[in-house]
Amino acid sequence: QAVAELMPYSGGLKRNIVQCLQDYDIPLLLSHTVVDIQGKDRVEGVTIAKVDTKGKPIPGTEITYPCDTLLLSCGLIPENELSAGCGVELSTVTGGPVVNESLETNVEGVFACGNVLHVHDLVDYVSGEAKEAGARAAQYIKGGKTDSLKENIVQIIPENGVRYTVPSTIRLSHMKNTQTVRFRVGREYRNVKVCIYADDQLLRSLPKKTMAPGEMENIILMDKDMVKKDGTDVARIRIAVEE
């Protein structure tokens, strides 16, 4: 009868909202939560209420829906017990491993991809990531170990509305001609720009009509982006949302 979302925006894909809710005239109630469940041996009704900016139910806004089923969708967290057990560093934002341009973790020879790395929207992204991780793992096996102390490493820094990036670092000697960087934002945005900085120099400004936490974004970095005008290597790539 209805979908209640605690946040003031949807965490799902727009096309899923259209195909699963709007096409069937199912209302999406943003900033709402379940406050009561009726029934003894089984569910007979559910009461929801609007919440304030702190997520607390607002008295007087309750709506009761007679129903026999309550489905809870509590989000996804990457399963990484195996990763943690072998010493892989995990991101406090995604719950998945922190990886470099090769999708390699801090434990040499251990690679990560798919939903164990970060939750994906589309299987196309998962497939592409898996292909890249497999190719990089094979390359590692054939090439042997690398001396990370001698690597020129560029840090990728999420700023101003960007919650995280994958990868988090780029080893310049392992970078291809281009590098895809995936990220998510922390809230809904309209008519903004995604700005890419090499240290303090603006490289590109990409206009975005809409951005939402439920939809993964990506940018493409080029090898020339990693070199400053004076010929020295860039130390940091910063990705930020600017209004």
Residue ranges of each PLM-predicted region?
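A short alpha-helix-loop-beta-strand transition element characteristic
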Residues: 1, 89-91, 145-147
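A broad structural signal for short, well-ordered beta-strand segments within beta-sheet-rich domains
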Residues: 1, 32-34, 38, 43, ...
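A Rossmann-like FAD-binding core segment of flavoenzymes
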Residues: 1-81, 177-210
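Short, glycine/charged-enriched secondary-structure capping and boundary segments
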Residues: 16-18, 85-87, 125-127
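FAD-site-proximal beta/loop scaffold in flavoenzymes
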Residues: 68-120
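Short, aromatic- and glycine-rich surface loops/edge beta-strands on solvent-exposed regions
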Residues: 181, 194-196, 224-243
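Aromatic sugar-binding surface patches on proteins
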Residues: 212-223
